[in-house]
């Protein structure tokens, strides 16, 4: 069979009524009972990942703070990316006891006390099983970790974990007051995920409680 319906254009998804996977299954009449994607890495891929990362005696923490397409107008999106002050605070807190590998493109913001890890996707995913802690945004890293059976802490801003996330994760929501909503620049979604600054609705740029994030990471 050929499946070509785009669930992103369905009313259920636009209204954020259910998880995206459930929306896709319902469009095709496929029963869904909560299955999650699974990724399989072969022994050679895992071996190459160890060769690339060269593990030492420190536990590894994986960190993804920014995402999005390389051509988006800004390298920082308020709608998806972790505020830089929060990200740096986490890096400072864990840098003395963890080797922090920062998943980012070369054109994305740089943090102190971390190592950038820039690898092809499959090689990067093979690094995930080497990690002890994982802190991500709503982007590809959280999905890769989930498909490998790994729990993560995920920070959410514009999108909702009930639509794009996983119950096994610790999902962190903004700890800020909404004071304004301006949706003029969005189409088919409440907020432009690339982060149109005119749409920023909160009363502060520091959207998360850093202690809440640290407390969830301690449980991993």
PLM regions: where:
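Catalytic machinery of carbohydrate-active enzymes
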Residues: 1-220
């Amino acid at each position: 069979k050929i499946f070509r319906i785009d669930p992103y254009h369905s009313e259920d998804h636009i209204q954020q009524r259910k998880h995206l996977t459930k929306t896709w299954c319902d469009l095709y009449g496929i029963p869904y009972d909560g299955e999650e994607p699974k990724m399989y890495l072969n022994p050679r891929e895992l071996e190459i990942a160890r060769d690339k990362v060269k593990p030492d005696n420190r536990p590894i923490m994986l960190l993804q703070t920014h995402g999005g397409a390389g051509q988006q107008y800004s390298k920082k999106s308020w709608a998806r990316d972790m505020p830089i002050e929060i990200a740096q605070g986490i890096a400072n807190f864990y840098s003395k006891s963890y080797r922090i590998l920062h998943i980012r493109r070369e054109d994305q913001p740089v943090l102190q006390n971390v190592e950038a890890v820039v690898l092809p996707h499959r090689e990067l995913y093979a690094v995930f099983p080497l990690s002890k802690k994982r802190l991500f945004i709503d982007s590809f890293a959280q999905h890769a970790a989930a498909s490998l059976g790994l729990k993560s802490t995920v920070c959410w801003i514009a999108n909702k974990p009930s639509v794009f996330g996983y119950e096994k994760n610790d999902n962190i929501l903004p700890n800020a007051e909404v004071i304004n909503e301006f949706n003029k620049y969005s189409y088919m979604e409440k907020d432009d995920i690339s982060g149109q600054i005119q749409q920023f609705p909160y009363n502060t740029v520091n959207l998360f409680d850093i202690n809440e994030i640290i407390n969830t990471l301690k449980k991993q």
